[in-house]
UniProtKB/Swiss-Prot annotation:
Gene3D superfamilies: 3.40.1360.10, 6.10.250.240, RecR Domain 1. It comes from the Bacteria. GO terms for biological process: DNA recombination; DNA repair. Keywords: DNA damage, DNA recombination, DNA repair, Metal-binding, Zinc, Zinc-finger. The gene is recR. Disulfide bonds: none annotated. The keyword DNA damage applies. It comes from Rickettsia typhi (strain ATCC VR-144 / Wilmington). This is Recombination protein RecR. Belongs to the RecR family.
């Protein structure tokens, strides 16, 4: 795309968001600009407020308005179970299912089978420390069913072998190559309920 002016540059930026192409981005930008005093300024103000308020949870990596997120600080969560997810989008998908009441560990990345990425980017030392300090009984690996997600899962299983917690994976029903954020709540609930132990 030839980014010749400010509008084209804004369209290009929107097109880089997940799930948006050039056409969708153009529609969004033109919609915002049609009533910029209301729509565009409202969006800008909300983005500025989000930038000021949102922080990464010091414990799990979730995004929240507090240093310890509402999930980690809740008295109503099962503190003996941690689900490992790749991103906050997958955490939100698990929460939407309404079927998981434990804690989370957000990796922030996954490991590519072909690349030589440093596994420390997954914050696994912090996870292992949490497992020991918080006396975790079960770790549910809820990575995506993509090649990268599977590679990441196998690495995590090996890494956590020194901890006595039960390690399980989400059950079948998640298609190979599927991402948790795109699953309906029923499929994800079944995958959580029927999770399989990792041997």
């Amino acid at each position: 795309m030839n980014k010749t002016n400010d509008i084209d540059q804004l369209i290009y930026l929107f097109s880089k968001l997940p799930g948006l192409g050039i056409r969708s981005a153009r529609r969004i930008v033109l919609y915002l600009l049609q009533d910029k005093d209301v729509r565009l300024k409202s969006l800008i103000n909300h983005l500025i407020e989000l930038d000021k308020k949102i922080v990464k949870c010091e414990i799990c990596g979730n995004m929240d308005t507090k240093n310890i997120c509402h999930i980690c600080s809740s008295e109503h969560r099962d503190k003996s179970t941690i689900a490992i997810v790749e991103t906050v989008a997958e955490l939100c998908a698990m929460e939407r299912s309404g079927n998981f009441k434990g804690l989370y560990h957000v990796l922030g990345h996954n490991l590519s089978a072909a690349s030589r990425q440093n596994p420390r980017i997954l914050r696994l030392p912090e996870l292992l420390k949490r497992c020991f300090v918080e006396n975790i009984k079960e770790v549910i690996i809820a990575t995506n069913s993509t090649l990268e997600g599977q590679t990441t899962a196998y690495f995590i299983i090996e890494y956590l072998k020194e901890h006595p917690a039960k390690i399980s994976r989400l059950a079948s029903g998640i298609p190979i190559g599927g991402e948790l954020d795109y699953l309906d709540e029923g499929t994800l609930s079944a995958a959580i309920n029927l999770r399989q132990p990792c041997e």
